[in-house]
């Protein structure tokens, strides 16, 4: 099994990948280093595939990985509706990519980070 260590212990690496995956699901576009983006791409693709399946088992599998964070708050008929990242994954992103067979994200290179010249990229969902 090959993966990037990203200069962290295994628990730190898993936590970081969960955080970045959840942030990408919520914001649909984030700026990060190239190595992190390449590593998180595989986890995001797996989460979108679970979102496309949409059954109870897929929801439970995704819930073990995606953090329970608020994705959006809106007002409908005098009531406040709070949507979590998991709900966004299954209600918005899953149906959006229903016809697409993989390749849900793209990585675009940007200028290097100012402090240490690390290669920076934008990872986003394909429309």
Curated annotation (Swiss-Prot):
Single annotated GO MF: structural constituent of ribosome
SUPFAM superfamilies reported for this sequence: Prokaryotic ribosomal protein L17
Family matches, as InterPro entries: Ribosomal_bL17 (IPR000456), Ribosomal_bL17_CS (IPR047859), Ribosomal_bL17_sf (IPR036373)
One biological process term in Gene Ontology: translation
Annotated GO CC locations: cytosolic large ribosomal subunit
Entry-linked Pfam families: Ribosomal_L17
Signal peptide: none
Keywords assigned by UniProt, alphabetized: Ribonucleoprotein, Ribosomal protein
Similarity comment: Belongs to the bacterial ribosomal protein bL17 family.
NCBIfam families: L17
Assembly description: Part of the 50S ribosomal subunit. Contacts protein L32.
Protein name, UniProt field: Large ribosomal subunit protein bL17
Species of provenance: Enterococcus faecalis (strain ATCC 700802 / V583)
Lineage: Bacteria, Bacillati, Bacillota, Bacilli, Lactobacillales
